[in-house]
Design a protein with these regions (language model features):
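C-terminal single-pass transmembrane alpha-helix
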Residues: 344-394
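A positional/structural detector of protein chain ends, strongest at the extreme C-terminus
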Residues: 1-3, 393-394
């Protein structure tokens, strides 16, 4: 009995050490709530505080700043934010900043795929159509509430544009949705692809719903993901594609994609990870899912384009590492985007070492039974034959 109590106490202490207190603030320090558009969340842990800034000003972006526990946000220069002014510091803290990182949906485009092979060819004449994110019309933020809650979410929805070149995308009430979520402890997301998250990570989702393709019915969609980080000393990232036999969390997907700095091991290291899959219906039916293929990773030369992430990280240069990764949706023979008019993709971004998925007890037990029973039968057969082997006739 005593041993059980000790075990429970140890588990409780470990859980409490990893758990964070979440507090959400919608448009902090902003007098005119209609012209702000920022969700700010603090995640207070036992050793540090993570400050999350989510916004679509300029481009959809998620900025994460790590500080000591006693360092607090003291002001936001909303005038500079509204004027897209990179020269003036936007966020000010009462104490030091340990590290900061960001993920930006820096480009979004439609690409022509006439052979339905999900192969993006940027050199093809009229092969791509970029959506100008600067002119997207975003609704008021949905969510961004909670004080001491176990989860905070915020959704940004664009349902129109000021660009005449792009207004056709929204002719069927189409929307572009940017959803962010953090949780106070570790676990797997309830929705496919059931990404593993920690209390030091955020989950980011991009959804393209009922858009009207402008390049014809044979097109797909792709986007550029810009990664920024000031905790990296060598300024470069590594992309890892690991194959696993375990698809219990993401049926039919046996690959994990991770972006991280292989030479960093400190807790300030920043990483991304996702499953290379895009779902084509609200129910996230496995049979309707398609690939989310990585095309290239290059230094993000254009990362200075204004958004909430560059508003902060421009003042952390020149030690900011950057990388731009192109991700394209589609699989060979999938019927293109217009078949379902739906595409959703998710990733996780966090501080610390890249978390490793572990095979669950369920899979271990099933594997043990699956391999163990045939082994027992084979061993029993060998023993039986050995014991009942007929004597050779003389």
């Amino acid at each position: 009995m005593f041993e059980k109590l000790v075990f429970i106490a140890v588990l409780t202490a470990a859980y409490a050490a990893d758990k964070r207190k979440l507090t959400a603030h919608l448009n902090p320090f902003c007098g005119d709530k209609q012209e702000c558009g920022l969700c700010y969340v603090t995640a207070e842990g036992s050793n540090d505080t993570l400050h999350y800034f989510w916004s679509v000003l300029g481009a959809p972006a998620a900025l994460s700043i790590q500080t000591p526990l006693d360092s607090q946000l003291t002001s936001i220069s909303w005038d500079a934010l509204r004027k897209h002014n990179l020269r003036e510091p936007i966020f000010k803290f009462s104490g030091p900043v340990l590290s900061s990182s960001a993920v930006v949906i820096s480009k979004l485009w439609e690409y022509n795929d006439p052979d339905n092979k999900a192969k993006m060819n940027a050199t093809m004449k009229n092969g791509t159509h970029n959506i100008d994110e600067r002119h997207l019309l975003w609704r008021s933020i949905e969510g961004c509430v909670g004080n001491g809650s176990s989860m905070v979410t915020a959704t940004f929805v664009a349902n129109g544009t000021n660009s005449t070149d792009d207004e056709g995308f929204f002719s069927r009430n189409g929307t572009i949705e940017f959803t962010l979520k953090i949780q106070d402890t570790d676990g797997h997301d309830t929705q496919l692809p059931h990404l593993f998250y920690t209390s030091s990570s955020s989950q980011i989702q991009l959804s393209l719903l009922s858009l009207s393709p402008q390049l014809g019915k044979t097109s797909q969609f792709a986007f550029e993901l810009t990664v920024l980080d000031d905790s990296s000393r060598n300024g470069s990232y590594r992309i890892s594609n690991e194959t696993t036999f375990d698809d219990e969390y993401t049926p039919g997907v046996f690959t994990n994609v991770a972006v991280f700095n292989a030479q960093e091991n400190s807790m300030s290291t920043f990483y991304l990870h996702w499953k290379p899959v895009c779902y084509r219906d609200p129910g996230r039916t496995v049979t309707l899912s398609v690939d989310a293929a990585i095309y290239n990773s290059t230094p993000a030369a254009s990362w200075w384009t204004f958004n909430v992430a560059t508003a902060w990280l421009a003042h952390r240069a020149p030690k900011v590492a950057s990388s731009a990764i192109s991700v394209a949706f589609g699989s060979e023979g999938d019927g293109w985007y217009q078949e379902n008019g739906f595409a959703t993709w998710a990733m996780s971004a966090g501080f610390g070492e890249l978390p490793q998925e572990h095979v669950s007890a369920t899979v271990l037990s099933v594997t043990s039974v699956g391999l163990g029973i045939p082994a027992i039968v084979a061993l029993g057969t060998v023993i039986y034959v050995s014991l009942h082997k007929p004597e050779p006739k003389l």
